Each structure stands twice: as C-alpha cells, then as structure tokens.
Amino acid sequence: LGDVYKRQPVHGDNYLYIYCLWVAGSFKGKGYAKSLIEYCINDAKEKGKSGVCILSSKKKKPFLADKKFLLKYGFKVVDTVKNEYELLALSFNGEKPYFSESVKEMRIIGQELTIYYGLQCPYIPNCIEQVQEYCTKNSIPLNLIAVDTLEKAKNLPCIFNNWAVFYHREYETNHLLNETFLKKKFQL
C-alpha cells in the first residue's frame, strides 16, 4: 500500500488503500465516482497490487464510502468493528486485508474530548482550529493527537479516516467537528 495506507490501522499485503472516495453533491449522477473507482482498480492492477481496500459502514455514514456503490464493483466485507464499521476489499489474488487488533475496542483511557487526526484531508486544519478556539473559550479539556508516524497509525484505538473523536472514553464519531457540531453532539 501507498503512504496513505501506512497511516491507517489496516494491514494488507500489497493492497492499495482508498482514503477518500467522495464527489460533491452538485456533481452527483455525472459518473465521476464511477470513473474514480474504475481508475483506481485499473491502476492497482497495472501496479501489480493484491487488491484495493476502503473503510465503510453497514449503514451510510458521513465521510465514509458508500458500501452499496462499492459492492457493485465486486468489493466484499473482509473485516468489521463493533458490528458497524467495515473494511471492504476487492482482492485480485484471494488475500484479504484486516484491521489492527487495537481497533476492536473503540475506547481510550481519557475522559476528555480527544481527537486523533491526520492531515490528508484539506478540511482538517480548519476543524482543529475551530475546536481549539471553542474548547479554550469554554474551558473544555481537549486532547489533540496527530497521527504522524507509522507506529501511531498501526496502534490507533479505533477505525480511522483521518479524524476520530472520543468523549468520556468512548468513540463517538469520525465526523469533522466545528462549534455547531460540538454543541449539538456533546452539549458542550
């Protein structure tokens, strides 16, 4: 897998990991997602990869790939976490990727608002800034953890799509936060 894969709590021999497959709503129905996934599959085959994998969920969730769309291209569920999040893979040789064992609990030790983040998504720096400002202004304890090494990525306590939020030890969401979402979701 490429460098993006190295920042995921996923193991797979020679797999290409799709971090994000998203098309803005205004472009829906124009075939862009189809073109992107077909290009990715062909690129992986040309590069001799074992397959392609991506994070999804049983029910559609924000910031995660649409499972129904991927199933149309032959992707299959190869691993699950908490009977909710799924690793989908399109294997070219029968080998299957899997989540790191550390992902299975989806819990941390700390009680404070804790965010694990990577910087592959262009929206993340702005979200971090908004969360820091809001928490500082309202005296809310905040723990920000940059996932900036291979070791941190492979030992994450949760599924990860470059943003993972915990509160009172529990995994809450991969939804990017801003002031409005903080107030609504956590009553902070």
Ranges and model annotations:
Residues 23, 29-45:
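Conserved acetyl-CoA-binding loop-helix of GNAT-fold acetyltransferases
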Residues 7-25:
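Conserved acetyl-CoA binding element of GNAT-fold acetyltransferases
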Residues 55-56, 71-88, 172-175:
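Conserved catalytic-core motifs of GNAT/GCN5-like acyltransferases
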Residues 103-137:
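Local sequence-structure signature of Cys/Sec-based thiol-disulfide redox active-site neighborhoods
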Residues 82-104:
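C-terminal "cap" of GNAT-fold acetyltransferases
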